[in-house]
Amino acid sequence: MKTIVIGGAGFIGSLVSQELIASGREVTVVGRRPPGAHTAALPYGYRCADLGNRAQMREILEPGCEVIDLAYATVPKTSYGDPAFDLLANLPGSVGLLEEAVAVGVRRLLLVSSGGTVYGPSCTLPIAESHPTAPISPYGITKLTIDHYALMFHHTRDLPVVVVRPANAYGVQQRSRTGQGFLAAAIDSILSDREIEIYGEVGTIRDYIHVSDVASGILAALDFGGDGDIYNLGTGIGASNLDVIAMLCPLAASTGRTIRVRHLPSRRFDVEANVLDAQKLRSACGWRPDVSLQRGLTEMWDHALTTSSTP
């Protein structure tokens, strides 16, 4: 089976590509830049191309192939500074990909959305796929709009689409200074002897899911998900910023480091709590996350200590 992974050299995409290769698929990764050191050695084809270039997408897609779309040009925090850019940098290319997928006749297109932003403030926890969607960030609004376009193409043009909505992914390859990823940023602050900044009394509550579990969930949805369906990928367990810091305290103490916290006023654009219910995918195929937050956080800490610079 030929599988094309757009955005497959990134933080999540590189793990997805490895899962696909292990499943016996022939994988082609599409990225805007040459592959990094952690992906260059993997046995797959690589194409430098831009999602926004429809001619390039038309050339890369093949009849009967699978497509996984992980490409996105912005992050939630920076989307507030230029909402128009967030929209224009992401929506046209995503819609163009859907059109090209219909034209070429792909076997299935899996869209990676955002479980952490599209639902907005929670009515109940954990959040199921049927929860109302009311995003309060430009990033979440654009992500949800792309979801709607994908489902519209399924209903009106028979495009076989599956949408997955991961919670907050983390892992050792996550960069700490991109404006996305509290765990990596907190570890970086400790190792750099800087204050960890949290907004509000305890910070936000998030469902942290290890990137390897996101990758296995994407593969499970690709293989067992229903066309036109949406699946959350999460642990169902929430942790506040202070909970995370409490887990980091013994790790820091073991190396003689101290943790300093700076409390800042709450921000209006932060969703207070986001915890996902992934029972739908579990019922479909038995998928469940494997890595606990404590285990994953320790893995990140140990990796940060053994690298030449902070994460």
Regions found by a protein language model. Give the residues of each.
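N-terminal Rossmann NAD(P)H-binding glycine-rich loop of SDR-like oxidoreductase domains
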Residues: 3-22
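SDR active-site strand-loop-helix element
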Residues: 6, 30, 67-73, 109-115, ...
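N-terminal Rossmann-fold cofactor-binding loop
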Residues: 30-34, 51
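Rossmann-fold cofactor-recognition segment
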Residues: 42-53
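A hydrophobic alpha-helix adjacent to the NAD(P)-binding/active-site core of NAD(P)-dependent oxidoreductases
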Residues: 46, 86-87, 101
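NAD(P)H-binding glycine-rich loop region in Rossmannoid oxidoreductase-like domains
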Residues: 51-89
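Catalytic helix-loop patch of NAD(P)-dependent Rossmann-fold dehydrogenases
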Residues: 81-96, 108, 117, 121-163, ...
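C-terminal substrate-binding subdomain of Rossmann-fold SDR/epimerase-dehydratase oxidoreductases
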Residues: 190-311
